């Protein structure tokens, strides 16, 4: 109203713009001179001005708002703006802080704009709710500047420097959140500016290569939005939230810091946390709490709570040994009795020869002990009647234990039904193989208590491979080794120097009169990634880049069957311990179950989100274990094809698996040098073992008793672990500390630093018993024989 009057007065030339105080004096003078129209208009302006003191209401609103803004009372300022029903005064570009005189500009000095009408404050123009650190209003242009590509690097650098300078009690938890924030900032930056995204990735990605090297390598090629859709890791991060476990104190500390620095990058980090992270707030962060951290890949049926995983790990499983055919058992016992009688006669003839020595158990007793762990007969009496009495008493004892402790016993340790897995009828070859197993078991080295002088490892080094060897496997009788190469060949060697030709088979070739100790198998058209011998050592399986699996005869050294079904390269193959069946793992994210007499898969195990890298059978043959690049391990029921266990906890792809001979425990090795030990019945992790540094673990193997584990990896070492240590089971390690074979931690660390440098050296856990170093030979395969002899093999790489 007063602005329009001042404008009219300027146009008529009657008055010049004056300060408010002088304008009130002139109005009084005009009234005395008798100018009635001007007196009425000036009277109205005077009445409005006096209603709110020396300033108009709009001036007071502007002054109060600027005062609240200057003092930082933004919440009060917003409430005043929201509840005020008056028109919004135009914002003055000069704030009270920048005026030299300290006086507020007068209302009349504001340039008029009669073409535009003032809008109510409920819908103000050019009004932003964002303010900088000093309380100044942030314009829309500044808001866009905060999301500029160059600010991503500044925001992440600010957070990284703050985490690095935090107190040690908070730094571990804060460092865990850096990785998902880095990934999501990078993916957002790819969509905005690929050039800055590449600069951001190259600058900060080395911080995560030690523990997330596989994912970092996969994200290296992401340079556009189309790449994000095609890349498995990037699409998984984009479509799922990342679960991170933090304490409430640490989360509050982080959010307070980001709110304080909201205008210089904190808002970017806050938006990432709000949109892409799923904080799991706990009182104190433990290793068990962090097992489920990572990308939340949950189906609709899980309702976002992960309940299906818990229900899956509670599904009853039968981990006991597979029941034997009664008629076949009788045949074995009859044959063993004959062998025992022959040994008894031989001992009587050579009375001076102490045959029993350290092992005074008959073959029949050993066979009973193999099938019943409760039977432990160490007496030297070979009388048949006493043997029968002992067996009868043992059976009665077993029945009584089952009655008394039936409720206490774990139902997961019961044996599966025999008809759940169809098997071909037994042959004379199977009978011969079982007798050989009993003999080897009786003569096995006992590792119940590790002695101060550990048994050595028999290491086979393959020379002149030109870095083409890709896999290796030993037969169960440790007589043959088979290796796959990148030029699609398979080579087999005789480890004991005997001929590979079967004397009972006449071969129509030029080598029939010779005794070859090495053979080459030709048939694949791509790199051979895995080989596996059958339990009877008569057949060999091979998986290749050409998407096929081939079955080879060790008698004729020819290919018998080619199994086609996978859509991508086959990474791993494994024969069932019962024979007849085998499993494969492939790049097509599936594992498959096959039988030797069918050219199509019997089961397809689908559920992994990335490559299935390794596969192994349970000792009873009724379950299959798979390790994947999605950092998980799964247990599958052969009879139904369902996933019955999900093992979460690795931070890198799982590339090696081994199952304890008693079927209770599972060990998994990953690309980052971590070995996890799991309880299969509960699906929980028992412990974590470190010692291979940050190098991949290629192979794992259990001893006959299941208390010792050996591992081989890319760090050119074979390491021996005491599995019972730091668990509820009795330890196999002696009370006296082991010093030899670089077994003590100090010597092992010093040797690791000498070999690989400090950057790739990790302090080993206390369950590391011994370390065996090679000369630049990655250990592709480790294996405990049935006699507890440790074998290892690899290709020398100068």
UniProtKB/Swiss-Prot annotation:
CDD domains: TAF5_NTD2 (cd08044), WD40 (cd00200)
Descriptive protein name: SAGA complex/transcription factor TFIID complex subunit TAF5
InterPro entries: G-protein_beta_WD-40_rep, LisH, TFIID_NTD2, TFIID_NTD2_sf, WD40/YVTN_repeat-like_dom_sf, WD40_repeat_CS, WD40_repeat_dom_sf, WD40_rpt
Assigned GO CC terms: nucleus; SAGA complex; SLIK (SAGA-like) complex; transcription factor TFIID complex
Annotated localization: Nucleus
Positions bearing Phosphoserine: 299, 411, 415, 787
GO MF, any single term: molecular adaptor activity
Comment field on protein domains: The C-terminal WD40 motifs are required for its incorporation into TFIID and function in SAGA.
Gene label: TAF5
Broad class of where this protein is predominantly found: nucleus
Basic and acidic residues bias locations: 371-411
Top-level taxonomy: Eukaryota, Fungi, Dikarya, Ascomycota, Saccharomycotina
Species in which this protein is naturally found: Saccharomyces cerevisiae (strain ATCC 204508 / S288c) (Baker's yeast)
Protein family according to the UniProt entry: Belongs to the WD repeat TAF5 family.
Role played: Functions as a component of both the DNA-binding general transcription initiation factor complex TFIID and the transcription coactivator SAGA complex. Binding of TFIID to a promoter (with or without TATA element) is the initial step in pre-initiation complex (PIC) formation.
Residue ranges constituting the LisH domain according to the UniProt record: 56-88
Any further remark recorded for this protein: Present with 14834 (+/-203) molecules/cell in log phase SD medium.
One Gene Ontology biological process: chromatin organization
SMART domains for the chain: LisH, WD40
Coiled coil segments of this chain: 329-349
């Amino acid at each position: 109203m007063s602005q329009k009057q001042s404008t009219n007065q300027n146009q008529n030339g009657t008055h010049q713009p004056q300060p408010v105080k002088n304008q009130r004096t002139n109005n009084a003078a005009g009234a005395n001179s008798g100018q009635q129209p001007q007196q009425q208009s000036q009277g109205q302006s005077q009445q409005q001005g006096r209603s709110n003191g020396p300033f108009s209401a709009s001036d007071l609103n502007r002054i109060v708002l600027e005062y609240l803004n200057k003092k930082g009372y933004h919440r009060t300022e917003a409430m005043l703006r929201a509840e005020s029903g008056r028109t919004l005064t135009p914002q003055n570009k000069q704030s009270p802080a920048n005026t030299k005189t300290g006086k507020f500009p007068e209302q009349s000095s504001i340039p008029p704009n009669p073409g535009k009408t003032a809008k109510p404050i409920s819908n103000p123009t050019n009004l932003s709710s964002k303010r900088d650190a000093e309380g100044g209003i942030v314009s829309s242009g500044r808001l866009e500047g905060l999301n500029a590509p160059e600010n991503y690097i500044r925001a992440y650098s600010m957070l990284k420097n703050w985490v690095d300078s935090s107190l040690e009690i908070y730094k571990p938890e804060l460092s865990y959140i850096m990785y998902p924030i880095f990934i999501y900032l990078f993916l957002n930056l790819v969509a905005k500016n690929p050039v800055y995204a590449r600069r951001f990735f190259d600058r900060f990605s080395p911080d995560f290569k030690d523990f997330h090297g596989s994912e970092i390598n996969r994200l290296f090629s992401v340079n556009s939005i189309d790449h994000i859709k095609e890349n498995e890791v990037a699409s998984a991060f984009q479509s799922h939230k990342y679960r991170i476990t933090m304490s409430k104190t640490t989360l509050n500390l982080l959010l307070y810091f980001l709110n304080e620095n909201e205008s210089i990058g904190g808002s970017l980090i806050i938006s990432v946390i709000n949109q892409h992270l799923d904080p799991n707030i706990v009182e104190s962060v433990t290793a068990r709490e962090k097992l489920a951290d990572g990308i939340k890949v949950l189906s609709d049926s899980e309702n976002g709570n992960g309940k299906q995983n818990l229900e899956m790990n509670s599904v009853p499983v039968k981990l006991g040994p597979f029941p034997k055919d009664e008629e076949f058992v009788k045949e074995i016992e009859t044959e063993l009795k004959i062998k025992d009688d022959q040994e008894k006669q031989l001992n009587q003839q050579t009375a001076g020869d102490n045959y029993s020595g350290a092992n005074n158990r008959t073959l029949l007793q050993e066979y009973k002990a193999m099938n019943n762990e409760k039977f432990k007969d160490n007496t030297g009496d070979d009388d048949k009647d006493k043997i029968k009495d002992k067996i009868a008493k043992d059976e009665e004892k077993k029945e009584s234990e089952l009655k008394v402790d039936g409720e206490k016993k774990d139902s997961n340790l019961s044996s599966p039904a025999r008809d759940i897995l169809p098997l071909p009828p037994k042959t004379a070859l199977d009978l011969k193989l079982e007798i050989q197993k009993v003999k080897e078991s009786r003569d096995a080295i006992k590792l119940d208590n590790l002695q101060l002088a550990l048994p050595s490892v028999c290491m086979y080094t393959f020379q002149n491979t030109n870095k083409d060897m890709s896999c290796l496997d030993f037969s169960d009788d440790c007589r043959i080794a088979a290796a796959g190469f990148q030029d699609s060949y398979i080579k087999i060697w005789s480890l004991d120097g005997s001929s590979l030709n079967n004397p009972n088979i006449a071969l129509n070739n030029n080598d029939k009169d010779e005794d070859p100790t090495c053979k080459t198998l030709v048939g694949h058209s791509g790199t051979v990634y895995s080989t596996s011998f059958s339990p009877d050592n008569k057949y060999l399986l091979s998986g290749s880049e050409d998407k096929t699996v081939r079955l080879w005869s060790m008698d004729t050294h020819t290919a018998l069957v080619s199994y086609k079904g996978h859509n991508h390269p086959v990474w791993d193959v494994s024969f069932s311990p019962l024979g007849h069946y085998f499993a494969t793992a492939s790049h097509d994210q599936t594992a498959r179950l096959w039988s030797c007499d069918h050219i199509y898969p019997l089961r397809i195990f689908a559920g992994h989100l990335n490559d299935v890298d390794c596969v192994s059978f349970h000792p009873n043959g009724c379950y299959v274990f798979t390790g994947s690049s999605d950092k998980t391990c799964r247990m599958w029921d052969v009879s139904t094809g369902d996933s019955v266990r999900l093992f979460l906890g690795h931070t890198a792809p799982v590339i090696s698996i081994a199952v304890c001979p008693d079927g209770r425990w599972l060990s998994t090795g990953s690309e980052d040098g971590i070995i996890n030990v799991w309880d299969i019945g509960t699906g929980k992790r028992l412990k974590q073992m470190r010692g291979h540094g940050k190098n991949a673990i290629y192979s794992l193997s259990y001893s006959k008793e299941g208390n010792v584990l050996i591992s081989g990896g890319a760090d050119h070492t074979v390491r021996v672990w005491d599995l019972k240590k730091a668990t509820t089971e009795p330890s196999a390690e002696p009370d006296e500390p082991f010093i030899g074979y670089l077994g003590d931690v100090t010597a092992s660390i010093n040797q690791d630093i000498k070999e690989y440098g400090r950057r790739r050296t990790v302090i080993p856990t206390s369950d590391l018993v011994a370390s065996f170093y090679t000369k630049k030979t990655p250990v592709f395969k480790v294996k405990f024989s049935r006699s507890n002899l440790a074998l290892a093999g690899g290709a020398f790489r100068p």
